[in-house]
Amino acid sequence: MEELDCEPAVTWIPGVNSKKKQMCFDWGPGEMLLCETSFNQTGKSEKVPSCPFIYIIRKDVDVYSQILRKLFNESHGIFVGLQKIEEELSGKSRKAQLVRVSKNYRSVIRACMEEMHQVAIAAKDPASGRQFSSQVSILSAMELIWNLCEILFIEVAPAGPLLLHLLDWVRLHVCEVDSLSADVLGGDNPSKHENFWDLVTVLVLQGRLDEARQMLAKEADANPSCAGMCRVLGDLMRTMPILSPGNTQTLTELELKWQHWREECERHLQDNTFAANPRLESLCKIMLGDEAALLEQKELLSNWYHFLVTRLLYSNPTVKPIDLHFYAQSSLDMFLGGESSPEPLDNILMAAFEFDIHQVIKECSIALSNWWFVAHLTDLLDHCRLLQSHNLYFGSNMREFLLLEYASGLFAHHSLWQLGVDYFDYCPELGRVSLELHIERIPLNTEQKALKVLRICEQRQMTEQVKSICKILAMKAVRNNRLGSALSWSIRAKDAAFATLVSDRFLRDYCERGCFSDLDLIDNLGSAMMLSDRLTFLGKYREFHRLYGEKRFGDAASLLLSLMTSQIAPRSFWMTLLTDALPLLEQKQVIFSAEQTYELMRCLEDLASGRPECGEPDAQRLQDDDIETTKVEMLRLALARNLARAIIREGSLEGS
């Protein structure tokens, strides 16, 4: 099934006049930058823009609410657990697990709503109080919708139990009766309380007939003149047939008993049993499902879906799921009476009663301020195998699209982005690509955060992102002159070019200071030094210094010579290497052989003559520098002396 988008709602931004000015904007993962340009709509430029501000527009502001963040965190664990439900489970065991998951989601919504309610009460600022109260209303509506979807789509309650579930639904969400009961029963004489009959009526409207009978007993004790009528009505309440969860009677048996009970109620009305007490007579009419009597209690019913459930309770207690939408539509029409139009919540509930899952999701997406509700509800319904046929026209399915939108919103927050990773993981078609795009945009403010991001990328073999993050961290370290950290990140990124750059900085630092920093890192490069020639040279040059320090002069000399003759050393560093050879040339014992000395001489002359082998300008710089010229002369002298000593020594060895 394909579904095309409709025109989105227009959002007006205060201070921005798009009719006069051309706008400039740039999208981010969860935000948009917007500003007016200096051009008007005719294309003419003005020197000064009328609104020289840049606006940051956020599409998911709810992620910044402290309380709603608890909702996001708690539901994340439920979501991940749901994805791990074994596909092999079937029948009652699978259904029971899905119902349990749904109840867990609802409990999280309710806990969040109750906390928000307490904050709204405690708010000192009226504007904040109104904002929190608005959020309470939204959360209450979310729980109301979710609970109904649970009954109709997940429980899939059949005729009989369906009404019991709907009664529980109404009792849970129309809860003013509890505070009213506490108020009435808290007095010395409840039957004389001004709201006594309102309480009795509401109890009957909600099918709480045992409690209503108890209230009538109090009225009978306080008013003996109507005791007989109260007793008769109480007996009718007691004998009303209701299909209880543990009852084994069939629907046919229930319908026969209910029909008999209804005839008895009608007989009492026809006999004017309650004529002397209009309130009791009204209650009897309600129990007969009299629509006029029910509509007289509009104020106590408070909404059309309460009216619907009460109407079904007393007129068709064995209503079949397929007939629900007829009763729902007529109840809505009767309750509103043409005086007002349905609210968005009414449309959502009506779509649910029509068993139109996709319309429920669509209406919720429009009405609610974030993607949390529709993403999690759709995912749960998809696990119930109710959405397999619904694909969107751009290639993704509805579940994945909504999860991607929700996860994208989480990535706009400085800490909730970690939750978003798991949502992307469970989107098989576009999740990986979306995660790659979003994770590259996370600001790496601290090294701890960078390590978290890096670990996530490495666990998912996101090679390019790992390289990118490591390179960013390496560049930050270089800017802060933390060369050891920079080298570690470039090695981790396997970035040869950047490793070369950092190695050059190490060598330059050595030339300026005469010693290496971060010796532990350089000493333990291991196979990582093969990443680039310059890094190999850095590691080997440090090894030369270590050998020299250990007085292993022969090994040090061989390594130094190999660094020069293998062309691995940068030409700009040759003079430093030759200078390092001076102490070895001046040793009492001959370290360099005649052949090795010839090689050193050749390297020195190559450097002094300025052969442009590597295109570097160092030879020309040496010729112009008196100090370097002095070094060259000293090296020539030392090499000549060492050559003479080496020839004599080698000749003596041959003669012997």
From Swiss-Prot:
The modification N6-acetyllysine is found at K92. Belongs to the nucleoporin Nup85 family. It is found in: Nucleus, Nuclear pore complex; Chromosome, Centromere, Kinetochore; Cytoplasm, Cytoskeleton, Spindle; Cytoplasm. Keywords: Acetylation, Centromere, Chromosome, Cytoplasm, Cytoskeleton, Kinetochore, Membrane, mRNA transport, Nuclear pore complex, Nucleus, Protein transport, Translocation, Transport. GO terms for molecular function: CCR2 chemokine receptor binding. This is Nuclear pore complex protein Nup85. The modification N-acetylmethionine is found at M1. GO terms for cellular component: actin cytoskeleton; ciliary basal body; cytoplasm; cytosol; kinetochore; nuclear envelope; nuclear membrane; nuclear pore. The lineage of its organism: Eukaryota, Metazoa, Chordata, Craniata, Vertebrata. Pfam families: Nucleopor_Nup85. Component of the nuclear pore complex (NPC). Component of the NPC Nup107-160 subcomplex, consisting of at least NUP107, NUP98/Nup96, NUP160, NUP133, NUP85, NUP37, NUP43 and SEC13. Interacts with NUP160, NUP133 and SEC13. Interacts with NUP37, NUP107 and NUP43. Interacts with CCR2. InterPro entries: Nucleoporin_Nup85. GO terms for biological process: chemotaxis; cytokine-mediated signaling pathway; lamellipodium assembly; macrophage chemotaxis; mRNA transport; nephron development; nucleocytoplasmic transport; protein transport. Essential component of the nuclear pore complex (NPC) that seems to be required for NPC assembly and maintenance. As part of the NPC Nup107-160 subcomplex plays a role in RNA export and in tethering NUP96/Nup98 and NUP153 to the nucleus. The Nup107-160 complex seems to be required for spindle assembly during mitosis. NUP85 is required for membrane clustering of CCL2-activated CCR2. Seems to be involved in CCR2-mediated chemotaxis of monocytes and may link activated CCR2 to the phosphatidyl-inositol 3-kinase-Rac-lammellipodium protrusion cascade. Involved in nephrogenesis.
